[in-house]
């Protein structure tokens, strides 16, 4: 249920992000293999210096604080999304995203 709800939430992300097998960078980077990945590390994506130098490694707590207010978490990020304030929606979205490994396949 949580993953299904997260899939619905991910629709807010699709104008800028892709995920899954064959995903490519768009306005934002591919989100495959997000858990444990360092911010600013997807090859071929033009990250802001702020993202590259943030030192963040994506885990649930980091993701939740970022997705609540991206520009507060990483001042200078290119991400213009206003954020998701609802904690349940943040959790659902994390559950959806983390089902995908670095190769875009579901774990």
UniProtKB/Swiss-Prot annotation:
A GO CC term assigned to this protein in UniProt: periplasmic space
UniProt keywords, alphabetically: Electron transport, Heme, Iron, Metal-binding, Periplasm, Photosynthesis, Pyrrolidone carboxylic acid, Transport
A Pfam family matched in the record: Cytochrom_C
Post-translational modification: Binds 1 heme c group covalently per subunit.
PROSITE patterns, per database record: CYTC
Residues bearing the modification Pyrrolidone carboxylic acid: 1
Residue positions binding heme c: 13, 16-17, 79
Gene Ontology terms: biological process: photosynthesis
Subcellular location(s) per record: Periplasm
Main location: periplasm
GO MF terms, alphabetically ordered: electron transfer activity; heme binding; metal ion binding
Keyword Heme found: yes
Cysteine pairs bridged by disulfides in the record: none
Record InterPro entries: Cyt_c-like_dom (IPR009056), Cyt_c-like_dom_sf (IPR036909), Cyt_c_1A/1B (IPR002327)
Family recorded in the similarity comment: Belongs to the cytochrome c family.
Role according to the record: Cytochrome c2 is found mainly in purple, non-sulfur, photosynthetic bacteria where it functions as the electron donor to the oxidized bacteriochlorophyll in the photophosphorylation pathway. However, it may also have a role in the respiratory chain and is found in some non-photosynthetic bacteria.
Protein name from the UniProt record: Cytochrome c2
Gene source species: Rhodoplanes tepidamans
């Amino acid at each position: 249920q949580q993953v299904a709800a997260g899939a619905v939430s991910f629709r807010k992300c699709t104008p800028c992000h892709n995920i899954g097998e064959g995903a490519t960078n768009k306005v934002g980077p591919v989100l495959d293999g997000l858990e444990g990945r360092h911010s600013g590390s997807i090859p071929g994506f033009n990250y802001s210096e702020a993202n590259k130098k943030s030192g963040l490694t994506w885990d649930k707590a980091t993701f939740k604080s970022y997705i609540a207010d991206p520009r507060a978490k990483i001042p200078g990020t290119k991400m213009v999304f206003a954020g998701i304030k609802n904690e349940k929606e943040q959790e659902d979205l994390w559950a959806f995203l983390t089902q995908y490994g670095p190769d875009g396949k579901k774990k």
